[in-house]
Amino acid sequence: MAAAERAWGAAVGVVRLCRRFCHVATPHTFKKQPLHQYVRRPLFPLRAPLCNTVRFMFIQTQDTPNPNSLKFIPGKPVLETRTMDFPTPAAAFRSPLARQLFRIEGVKSVFFGPDFITVTKENEELDWNLLKPDIYATIMDFFASGLPLVTEETPPPPGEAGSEEDDEVVAMIKELLDTRIRPTVQEDGGDVIYRGFEDGIVRLKLQGSCTSCPSSIITLKSGIQNMLQFYIPEVEGVEQVMDDDESDEKEANSS
């Protein structure tokens, strides 16, 4: 009998404890709060909407032939079908993401590809392990913000896109660049832009990881030039075109 009373007392104590700390629902409480409010209430307070999963996106990195450039792949489209180069902080006024990446100490240039972002550091002494956490956070925060990647469109350089005024040779050069050469260069985190053809010389602009790559001349001569000459006999050579700021930097580094 005593054991039964103790068991009953323990059961009553458990029920009271549950009502006190677990807030067991009763008909009285349902009148105050409908059942759907209990069902929809999350177990933990949410800091962001459930649909905002991009904050936890998985970003992959890929090495490039340039040891100072690293390719960041966010797993979603960046510019989809085109590329955009930001060689200096001044050029980043068109993109909120590029501006934020330049605020990271040690970042020299930024390049957007169809589905990747190439970041180039200032020198080989900088450790990627120190830069990558800030770059990861900047990319994730930007995609979570929903802001547009580019706020001001810029027209392509003259002669880059195909034109009805192009002669047969120029049209073949542009088609070969777009179908065979540029996709390969973009896999290495860069791009090559057509700037002109005169007296048998194709003038090209290297971007992204190719800009300061030690093997950029080999890429031009052994890769691009050989392919163009193989398919287009009128091509006698390839020449690299540099912007004024790139030429000044190259002269400063060589002096």
Curated annotation (Swiss-Prot):
One of its GO terms (molecular function) is iron ion binding. Coiled coil: none annotated. It is found in: Mitochondrion; Cytoplasm, Cytosol. Gene3D superfamilies: Fe-S cluster assembly (FSCA), Scaffold protein Nfu/NifU, N-terminal domain. Residues 1-29 form a transit peptide. GO terms for biological process: iron-sulfur cluster assembly. The keyword Transit peptide applies. Keywords: Cytoplasm, Iron, Iron-sulfur, Metal-binding, Mitochondrion, Transit peptide. It holds the Pfam family NifU. Iron-sulfur cluster scaffold protein which can assemble [4Fe-4S] clusters and deliver them to target proteins. Belongs to the NifU family. Monomer and homohexamer; the apo-NFU1 is a monomer, while the holo-NFU1 is a hexamer composed of a trimer of dimer that is probably linked by some 4Fe-4S cluster. Interacts with HIRA and EPM2A/laforin. Interacts with BOLA3. Interacts with HSPA9. This is NFU1 iron-sulfur cluster scaffold homolog, mitochondrial. The gene is Nfu1.
